[in-house]
A protein has these predicted regions:
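Short beta-strand/turn micro-motifs composed of small residues
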Residues: 55-57, 136, 165-167
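A phosphate-binding catalytic loop at a beta-strand-loop-alpha-helix junction
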Residues: 134-148
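C-terminal substrate/ligand-recognition segments
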Residues: 69-77, 83
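Catalytic phosphate/metal-binding cores of nucleic-acid and nucleotide-processing enzymes, i.e., regions
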Residues: 3, 84, 88, 123, ...
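A structural signal for isolated positions on well-ordered beta-strands in alpha/beta enzyme cores
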Residues: 52, 133, 162-164
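Active-site-facing substrate-recognition patch
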Residues: 1-52, 59-70, 93-129
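PRPP-dependent phosphoribosyltransferase catalytic core
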Residues: 146-199
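Hydrophobic anchor at the start of a short beta-strand
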Residues: 87, 132, 159-161
């Protein structure tokens, strides 16, 4: 597996510190700024100043009355809004019950879309947004994103729902050509109840 991409992914999931800067700032903000500065036309199809960004919940419910819990998708959403790639951040999705972390699950044992559907709740705001973009830190198969989109569409029928992940896995490739390589693809439920991501 690519050492460089592993390093970047780990830094993103811990949100810091950014490389090469003294004092170091948050990694998420650094990555989003870098993508924005380089230009990423594919992302302009998904993100924009009219989009309401909804961060995906963690694998476990937030501890009651505990503040400052690391929630990377929310930090990504805030960084995207700061760069003009979103209108506002609305945490509509919450985790009601624990699911296994995909990062620690064996291949074939990751929670599927239905497990995520059963473990999440959605809260409707006062007004219906015109379009929503779900935000995640890392996408593997896309089961969590697929479940989140289903829940949002159940509350807001007919609304446009897109998804964005800062990192997409590429399997066991020995090395990657580019760390920054935005693409637009699809995530769909397969006949076996799982999620398929292309590319």
């Amino acid at each position: 597996m690519s050492k460089q991409s592993q390093f970047v992914c780990h830094r993103i999931k811990q949100d810091g510190p950014e490389p090469g800067e003294k004092p170091a700032g948050p990694m998420v903000e650094w990555v989003v700024r870098r993508i924005r500065a380089r230009g990423a036309p594919p992302l302009d199809e998904i993100l924009g100043p009219d989009a309401v960004l909804v961060p995906l919940p963690r694998s476990a419910p937030f501890p009651p009355n505990q503040k400052n819990v690391l929630w990377v998708p929310n930090r990504i959403a805030q960084a995207l809004v700061a760069e003009g790639w979103g209108h506002t951040v609305e945490p509509m999705l919450a985790r009601a019950t624990l699911v296994q972390k995909s990062a620690f699950a064996e291949s074939g044992q990751r929670p599927g879309p239905q497990a995520h559907l059963d473990s999440m709740t959605v809260t409707r705001g006062l007004t219906a947004p015109e379009r929503i973009v779900l935000i995640d830190d890392v996408v593997t198969k896309g089961a969590t994103l697929l479940a989140g989109a289903s829940l949002i569409r159940g509350v807001f029928p007919g609304i446009q729902v897109d998804c964005f992940a800062l990192v997409r896995t590429l399997g066991l490739q020995p090395e990657v050509d580019r760390i920054v390589d935005p693409v637009v693809g699809t995530i769909a439920r397969n006949p076996w109840g799982g999620a398929d991501r292309r590319p």
